[in-house]
Amino acid sequence: MAKQAIKKGVGIKKTGLHSFKEKHGLIPENNGSYTSVSNADKPIDWILMPKAFVSATRLPGIPLNTVCSVIGHSNVGKSTLINHAIAAAQRQGYIPVIIDTENSFSFQYAQSMGFKCEPIYGDVEVESVDPETGDVTITTENQIIYWDGAFLYYNNKILCDKFGNWDYNQGKQVSKKRNVAVVEDVAMCINTLLDAQDNGEIDQGFLFVWDSVGSIGCYKEYNAKGIGNPQWTAAAISAAFNRIANDRIPSSKKISSKYNNTFLYVNKVWMDAMTNPVGPAIMQTKGGKSLKYATRLEILMGGQLTSGVKRLTATYKGSDYSYGIETKIKILKNHLDAPHNVCYEGKMIASDVGFVDPEDLDDYKKNHISNILKKLQEITNTDKIITVDDIEFKEIEETD
């Protein structure tokens, strides 16, 4: 049987891919105002960090429009890092949103790194008990009752006040408010502020800082009346932060987005000996791995097995004043574009005024010797005037 000749393309209208994109609105109009169909990214920009950070990491700072994390043991410089970040963000015109579920944020310490905040004073009734008679005396003192400035601050109490009437199982508000903050409240807080930005109520970009992931449980744990399960919180974080970490924050890097929004969260580490019973323990973070997967830059402060820091002390007749720590800093994960996709490690000194390059330690001691002597004078409570010749500087190393 003879084969029938078939002419290719007969009856089919030829259209290029460009024409298809134009027809379906997949190409932005070149009128200077690009719509959501634009797939181009803004040039990478940064929340600029101090010299010590740049020298140690080879990065200018915290990348805008990303999810970033700083992890590590206690007392390794994590708070110093986030304080530098919020101060820099404020200077650069962004609104720092401090979500303090550890209830440990110090406005005074942040001020020493350039954070602008103003104390508001008010009269507060203070009770004092006489240790001999047991009599209670109530006096009125003028104390700081509020810190004001170009920032937003939420602790557990404020989160409960604003979002404590949410029943996250039913997805609706109820009449009774919780007095315990949960991880879903943190996500609700971030989404509420991003909604306000979308609606034009706030005309600035945000730096969201959450300290820290493992400090509170989830709504299911709250309903279980204290019976906890780490998997519950991990699942709650995965569900509550999915859109934030994978859409709302990273989408702000597109040129179609008017604002730059960044999310920096703090997480503590723990050593998992069960996963690898015949080998060394594995460093893990709290709250599961969903946020970890969405993180573009992961920064480890200190060591892995221990804090791995050096305590920098000034000593006078057996009394020590710790004026800083020398801490390690390592980029564990970097999914930034070249040439910034580098993973260096180095050292920094965390002091009362922020990070100091180890090369500048002698200059730091020289410039702050009066404060060091003052602190030693207070600790020793001596009538003798302590001078620099009376003290000894030590470095006490905690091995990794």
Show the residue positions of the predicted features.
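Detector for small/aliphatic-rich hydrophobic stretches
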Residues: M1-N75, T80-I99, D167, D400
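Phosphate-binding/switch region of NTP-binding enzymes
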Residues: Q231-S351
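Short His-Asn-centered micro-motif
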Residues: I71-H73, I99-E102, V266-K268, M301
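C-terminal regions of RecA-like/P-loop NTPase motor modules
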Residues: M1-A40, T306-D400
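Conserved catalytic network of the ASCE P-loop NTPase/AAA+ motor domain
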Residues: P60-P63, A88-Q92, L193-D203, R248-Y259, ...
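Short, hydrophobic/amphipathic alpha-helical packing segments
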Residues: N83, V183-N191, S238-N246
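Extended hydrophobic secondary-structure segments that form protein cores and membrane-embedded regions
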Residues: V70, I99, L207-D211, L264-Y265, ...
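Conserved inter-motif catalytic segment of the P-loop NTP-binding fold
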Residues: Q92-P230
